[in-house]
């Protein structure tokens, strides 16, 4: 039997191992305490990190809290403790307390996030944290070379830690993140915790081999496999892997086999799908028991010491639970706090136009505004498919591309490859990396080439970007601008280059949506978009890029348009038309045709909303209460188009003023065809607007 330990003579690595062993016991006691509280209906969900303790704590010794950046997943409880999250703070989240520092009671347990620790607020989406982690690592490179950037901090040798279960390796976003990390030589530690299951799905049912075998030979990626149940092995291999990253040698995938002695969560019963002998084997290979035996064998502890530490940590967790249970719960009214923060400033009115000022197209106004804003703010980076001019090695020999519509032409040449660059053809990659950059204080401007191809980025837009402020209770923000070419009227655009769908994103809390129709508004709204600290979907109608009718002089630099403020295109007192995007001009044409027929002012008021989220309810209500009639015109399909929301609002807020039913004109529930007559039959035409206005006025 080993002699009783004498802390004074234990060497430093063993002393650290004892301290970490204490944290491992705290982690396990927290799981057990939450399970007890869940069974007592005092917490409402429980998911454990049991079996993963040695992995998290073995790595933590080489990681640096509040220095490195962390994108953990829900089994990283032991790591979070090592980084500085306290047992009380974890239990505050479990009970849903107002003082929960991660989310103020908004998120499930084990969804940590503390800005002061660089511990990024996480979502429940498996694997979706990988792409923001890549963006964070990119930001480290960028910021460390520009230490003067306001609100941005980097040390030069920090790394980004991102973890996931083996099951999440089936997600495409994981593979996209590996590809980019390896190609860009980024300082990322990918930790894959393999407990053999994704809830009830065996790893062998998902992949032909463990992930460390599948990526062996992946160029630019070091691959490490370790027994994650053994703290000392993890600590040794982890130290080497992390040192590899810190010296700039590139990313590491760290694959660790671990156990899952408890079910996936308390909503699961693993005895339904795991045989008894398998669970017995896991119990025999419990990392905490192995750790205790190793410490005893090395003379760091005696069995009595292990029992004493177990009792002490149990009492510590029990006391923390009492504090959490006695903490106040959130005020239900606070559920509307921290959804989004719209910059608040006065409508600037008409811009002052310099005599003989150059008049530019809608597309050129956007291009020049991007150039202007990039010159002002070095935090802005523009990236996406084909946005760069050309490969730097041939830039002096060619004219340059600058986007399929030329909107980013010249930005790379003016500001360099670090600030305007091409990405893989992967929309989730584009947006997800932007999320990570934004979390680090940069002002990323991502481009989605066509709205029709935005769908692979839906999870990053709606779950990672849009929820950032709310899920962290205001601790984190995501100042990301996503420019998207949208809409039809192209003649030949066909199905996948012609559609709109702004109403889908209007349904997502946390996203701001701009949809300008003329050059000056595009400039004013884009300036405001860069001033926002929340994600902005900046919709640019392709048909409007080079038209003559919506050209304007570039407004003065200080001319910014507030979101949520529409504008009167025409004035009238007989009917109101609400519209946006490319249908604004078609509505003007329709009113012009009606006026030409009668040689009089037909009294129709056209309102251009300019932004969809938020949208200007006041201007609509004021107009409809004066005119008594409302027609809403949009390019999107009629069913569930954004016009339905406006119609519902008008019926509610203006019912007693209405002299006729609210009318809507949009695309039928079909797709845009290639042959021009098919497109004309789908998208609202001037003749359709004239027809509906006549009927509305005659009602």
Predicted regions and their residues:
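Terminal amphipathic helices with adjacent charged low-complexity linkers/tails
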Residues: 311, 315-353
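Active-site glycine- and acidic-residue-rich loops that bind
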Residues: 167-172, 229-238, 516-523, 639-640
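A short alpha/beta connector and helix-capping loop motif
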Residues: 171-192, 462, 466, 471, ...
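Short glycine/serine/threonine-rich phosphate/pyrophosphate-binding segments
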Residues: 55-56, 129-133, 169-177, 199-200, ...
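Glycine-rich, charged/polar anion/phosphate-binding loops
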Residues: 174-177, 236-243, 367-369, 467, ...
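Thiamine diphosphate
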Residues: 1-161, 180, 189-322, 326, 336-535, 539, ...
